[in-house]
């Protein structure tokens, strides 16, 4: 009979008996005064019915239950291997069987004597007969052992939690909740919600602390009490831990990840190792449960005792993105001691099984011949799981046979999954009890196979712990534990305060903090940070500025990573880089700003943050003047902390891919008067420089986007309210594609287009963000246009129109003012390669017609490779970007062309396009702009010098040759390239890999200790009168990477260029 049907019948029978009993009681009261005969009949019927009900219940419930107990005794028990190693709770009527595990440790052989507990077969004999030991005297086929050992820890792919209930792990009755409220000594059972543990980046190696309790509060015991009384404070006993690994790799990828859980309080791997699991890094999240038998006293923080070490393999995942998120759920007991709780058979079985498998997994050899079952199947051969670090340095011994190294002893260094190398593992199993025939010969390392660890294919482990003829070498050690466990007040680096005057203007600097001065401040951990070579994490700025809600002003805090000049300036376009935050103190009196000191690395250093003149800067400045100013100056306080656990994504862009958060652009500021309604149209083109009045600023976004012709991406518009939040209004933003902007005349037309409404309110964020998906734009968005005037819209893909739903109104005086910025989001795709347009550092005026002194004779060489067709990123290998140009001008040089005078002449230029050039006119192509706006760079650059001879000289009359040399630093440094052009006209080319001290990146435009200035080129003409033009071109190789943004380059126009176009409706 099925158990579910039996349970239903039992419930129905109990209800019938209760109804008969109540009916009998009611009839008894009714016939109490009638007759004795009725009472007798009522008793008889009741007893008769109860008799048959009890018989039926015994036959169908009690008898099967007793039969199940008898058949499940040890005499009749057979193991069901399908469910023997699972941690799933059993059914209602299913009996759980206990298991006994015995450990037999055979003594070593002594002088050839074989004891009764020695293995029956040697390792060589077992290899021949294809069998393996399971006890000292029993063997089974190796295939059977591998099949059963493969179910070490099953990673379950599920969208729901698989953590057992409290009732499955501890014996509880229905009065437990009431008893726990009345008694102080009653245990408290807690099942936590899902707690975020951390994330593993695409780099594929991380260590994470596993939180046991959601919020730890230390229980303080009176020191005056005896030890036995103080020891009875509440302990934390962890029954089960569920780890959830949510991978973000592509579903069709083979990226795998593995983790090892261990107790940090132990130093040996046998005591510390709690278990491991492996999973794929894509698809449905993987769940795995551990029963760690973990107890923590009241005086220790349980959230610092367990640690998870995660690694990934076969990963083509980008390091700047998150590969997997790790979270945990725990079931623990807070009690006075283990005697206060009663564990179920299920928990006892699971705990014992975890201990046995952990011991088998982390054996002395640390080599596992089987791995967890996975679906779908993934390749985990020779998977290297990190363990507690412990290595021994060995010194070389010089003999007449050569230099020999004693074998390094690896104790708890790593665990290897699915070892596929030689089956003969040193010091494993029965082999460690064999008598060594040639002890002296086996003592030294003669080949790779003689080493104790055979895991790493690159050979890093083979070289670990070996020295070459060194004696008395002292190793310097550092430990990051002190900075990682410090509280926030101890992590303070610098603090200060300032005032916001009443006469500020947009761009006024409120306060400036140069990061190269951090090492000189007397903070708590400054001395320790000065000692460390790499400080993990980021920096955080906390800012507090209290103003009345009737006031309003826009503020911005920005991190200027590459400050290439001693004069910081106050230009908003130059200082608002990739890492900044804008807010209104009337809405947000308290803000936090976290930034990455080195945008190309996950660490920073106190002594590599620039020099006295060229140091990275944290600057707080105004975005606007006071809008309804206060009566007195407002005060602002700030503090800088280091955050060792907060690791922001790297800001690294390649020619084929760039993260979306690196693309930002400041559009401008709009003001709306009260009682009026107006609409504005504007263009968001990240390939154009930022324009603010007469000032034009090139940023990393405009430089990188200038390399391409078209883009497809989501666009987010940020509206930061700078006026008082008590001045309100409702606005709409719509996108008008193509030339349809010319037909917009009323709100009805705008409402028929893709649009969204928004407003500002007090008590929320200062910024409203609106996303326009890329599906809204239809066609690709143009990037490589050069006309800065918004009135000329011939080559504009589309316009955004901002219009009012209602008139601005308030009891206060003034205008509603906000600042507009644009940024990209989601997956960005660039199409086509653009060689850019010939702008110069001396460019004045607006548009492409005013201020140009490029006469028709040099149009062709300057516009070399312009107007590319529809292209792919592979075209970067063929497109050359113009960098510098020289043209012969009559009467400018000594001598005369007609008299055939000879006058040598030199052209000099630094190859990053900076101002230190001589006789070369710098052409600001996308190549030059990108080199001048990125903070870091590494990769190969190619350069070409194209010379055109004058047609006035016949070939037989030429006496000149052109020599090109490239130097490491200045012209007084050594040359790394030298070439001679023997023909009248021709081309010379060379390449150079740019490297630097910070993870291989070179700092561009600012000083990092150990870096040097950029390369310089020298073009020497034997006779200047024989040449017409000399043009310098640059080209990117496919391995080029750019990181971060330094202070943007800028120039001024003759007249102001409007950004917004007013539309009256």
UniProtKB/Swiss-Prot annotation:
Keyword DNA-binding attached: yes
GO MF, any single term: structural molecule activity
Cleavage (site feature) positions: 466-467, 868-869
InterPro entries: Como_LCP (IPR003181), RNA2_polyprotein (IPR003182), Viral_coat (IPR029053)
Keyword RNA-binding set for record: yes
Annotated Pfam families: Como_LCP, Como_SCP
SUPFAM superfamilies attached to this UniProt entry: Positive stranded ssRNA viruses
Keywords: Capsid protein, DNA-binding, Host cell junction, Host endoplasmic reticulum, Host-virus interaction, Inhibition of host innate immune response by virus, RNA-binding, Suppressor of RNA silencing, T=3 icosahedral capsid protein, Transport, Viral immunoevasion, Viral movement protein, Virion
GO cellular component: host cell endoplasmic reticulum; host cell plasmodesma; T=3 icosahedral viral capsid
GO BP field: symbiont-mediated suppression of host innate immune response; transport of virus in host, cell to cell
Name of protein: RNA2 polyprotein
Organism (species): Broad bean wilt virus 2
């Amino acid at each position: 009979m099925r158990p579910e049907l039996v349970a239903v019948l039992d419930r129905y029978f109990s209800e019938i008996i209760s109804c008969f009993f109540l009916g009998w009681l009611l009839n008894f009261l009714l016939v109490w005064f009638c007759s004795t005969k009725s009472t007798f009949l009522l008793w008889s019927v009741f007893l008769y019915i109860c008799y048959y009900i009890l018989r039926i219940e015994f036959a169908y419930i009690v008898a099967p239950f007793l039969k199940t107990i008898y058949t499940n005794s040890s005499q009749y028990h057979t193991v069901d291997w399908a469910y023997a190693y699972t941690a799933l709770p059993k059914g209602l009527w299913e009996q759980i069987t206990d298991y006994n595990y015995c450990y037999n440790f055979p003594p070593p052989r002594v002088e050839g004597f074989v004891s009764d507990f020695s293995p029956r077969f040697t390792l060589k004999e077992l290899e021949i007969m294809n069998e393996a030991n399971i006890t000292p005297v029993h063997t089974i086929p190796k295939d059977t052992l591998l099949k059963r050992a493969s179910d070490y820890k099953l990673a379950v792919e599920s969208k729901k939690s698989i953590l057992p209930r409290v009732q499955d792990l501890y014996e509880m009755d229905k009065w437990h909740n009431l008893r726990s409220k009345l008694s102080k000594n009653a245990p408290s059972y807690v099942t936590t919600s899902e707690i975020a543990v951390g994330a593993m980046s695409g780099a594929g190696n991380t260590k994470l602390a596993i939180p046991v309790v959601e919020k730890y509060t230390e229980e303080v015991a009176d020191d005056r009490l005896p030890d036995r009384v103080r020891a009875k404070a509440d302990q934390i006993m962890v029954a089960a831990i569920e780890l959830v690994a949510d991978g973000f790799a592509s579903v069709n990828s083979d990226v795998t990840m593995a983790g090892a859980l261990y107790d940090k309080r132990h130093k040996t791997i046998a005591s510390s190792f709690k278990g491991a699991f492996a999973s794929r890094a894509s698809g449905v999240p993987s769940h795995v449960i551990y029963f760690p038998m973990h107890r923590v006293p009241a005086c220790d923080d349980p959230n610092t005792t367990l640690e998870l070490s995660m690694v990934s393999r076969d990963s083509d995942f980008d390091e700047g993105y998150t590969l997997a998120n790790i979270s945990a759920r725990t079931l623990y007991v807070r009690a006075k001691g283990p005697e206060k709780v009663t564990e179920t058979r299920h928990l006892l079985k699971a705990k014992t099984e975890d201990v046995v498998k952990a011991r088998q997994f982390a054996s002395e050899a640390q080599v596992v011949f089987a791995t967890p079952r996975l679906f779908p199947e993934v390749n985990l051969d020779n998977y290297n799981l990190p363990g507690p670090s412990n290595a021994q340095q060995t010194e070389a011994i010089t003999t007449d046979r050569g230099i020999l190294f004693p074998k390094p002893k690896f104790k708890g260094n790593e665990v290897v999954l699915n070892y596929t190398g030689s089956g003969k593992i040193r010091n494993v199993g029965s082999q460690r009890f064999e008598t060594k025939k040639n002890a002296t010969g086996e003592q030294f390392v003669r080949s790779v196979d003689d080493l104790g660890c055979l895991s790493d294919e690159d050979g890093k482990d083979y070289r670990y712990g070996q020295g070459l003829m060194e004696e008395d070498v002292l190793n310097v050690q550092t430990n990051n534990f002190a900075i990682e466990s410090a509280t926030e007040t101890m992590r303070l680096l610098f603090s200060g305060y300032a005032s916001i005057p009443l006469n500020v203007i947009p761009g006024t600097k409120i306060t400036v903090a140069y990061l190269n001065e951090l090492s000189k401040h007397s903070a708590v951990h400054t001395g320790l940070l000065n000692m460390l070579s790499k400080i993990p994490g980021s920096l955080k700025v906390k800012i507090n500025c209290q103003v009345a809600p009737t006031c309003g002003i826009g503020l911005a805090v920005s991190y200027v990573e590459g400050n290439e000049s001693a004069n910081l300036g106050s230009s908003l376009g130059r200082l608002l880089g990739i890492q900044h935050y804008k807010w209104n103190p009337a809405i947000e009196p308290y803000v936090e700003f976290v930034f990455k000191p080195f945008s190309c690395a996950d660490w920073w250093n106190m002594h590599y943050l620039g020099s006295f003149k060229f140091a990275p800067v944290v600057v707080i400045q105004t975005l606007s003047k006071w809008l309804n100013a206060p009566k007195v100056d407002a005060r602002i306080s700030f503090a800088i902390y280091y955050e060792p656990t907060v690791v922001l994504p790297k800001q690294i862009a390649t020619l084929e891919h760039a993260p979306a958060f690196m693309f930002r652009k400041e559009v401008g500021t709009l003001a709306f008067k009260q009682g009026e309604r107006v609409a504005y149209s504007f263009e968001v083109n990240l390939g154009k420089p930022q324009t603010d009045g007469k000032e034009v600023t090139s940023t990393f976004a405009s430089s990188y986007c200038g390399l391409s012709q078209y883009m497809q991406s989501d666009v987010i518009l940020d509206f930061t309210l700078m006026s008082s939040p008590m001045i309100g209004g409702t606005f709409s933003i719509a996108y008008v594609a193509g030339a349809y902007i010319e037909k917009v005349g009323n709100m009805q037309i705008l409402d028929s287009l893709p649009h969204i409404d928004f407003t500002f309110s007090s008590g929320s964020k200062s910024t409203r963000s609106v996303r326009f998906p890329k599906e809204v734009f239809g066609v690709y968005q143009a990037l490589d246009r050069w006309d800065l005037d918004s009135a000329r819209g011939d080559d504009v893909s589309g316009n955004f129109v901002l219009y009012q739903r209602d008139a601005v109104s308030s009891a206060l005086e003034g205008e509603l003012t906000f600042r507009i910025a644009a940024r990209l989001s989601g997956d960005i795709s660039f199409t086509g390669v653009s060689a850019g347009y010939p702008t110069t550092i001396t460019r004045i005026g607006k548009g492409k017609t005013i201020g140009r002194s490029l006469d028709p004779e040099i149009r062709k060489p300057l516009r070399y490779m312009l107007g590319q067709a529809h292209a792919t990123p592979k075209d970067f290998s063929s497109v050359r970007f113009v960098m510098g140009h020289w043209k012969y001008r009559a009467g400018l040089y000594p001598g005369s062309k007609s008299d055939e005078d000879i006058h040598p002449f030199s052209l000099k230029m630094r190859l990053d396009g900076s101002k230190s050039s001589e006789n070369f006119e710098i052409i600001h192509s996308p190549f030059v702009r990108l080199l001048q706006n990125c903070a870091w760079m590494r990769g190969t650059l190619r350069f070409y010098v194209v010379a055109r001879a004058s047609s006035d000289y016949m070939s037989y009359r030429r006496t000149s040759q052109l020599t090109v040399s490239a130097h490491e630093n200045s012209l007084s440094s050594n040359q790394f390239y030298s070439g001679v052009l023997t023909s009248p006209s021709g081309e010379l080319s060379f390449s150079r890999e740019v490297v630097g001290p910070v993870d291989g990146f070179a700092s561009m435009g600012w000083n990092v200790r150990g870096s040097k200035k950029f390369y310089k080129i020298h073009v020497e003409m034997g006779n200047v009168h024989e040449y017409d033009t000399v043009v310098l071109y640059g080209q990117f190789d496919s391995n080029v990477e750019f990181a971060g943004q330094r202070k943007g380059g800028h120039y001024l126009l003759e007249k102001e260029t409007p950004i917004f176009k007013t539309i009256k409706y």
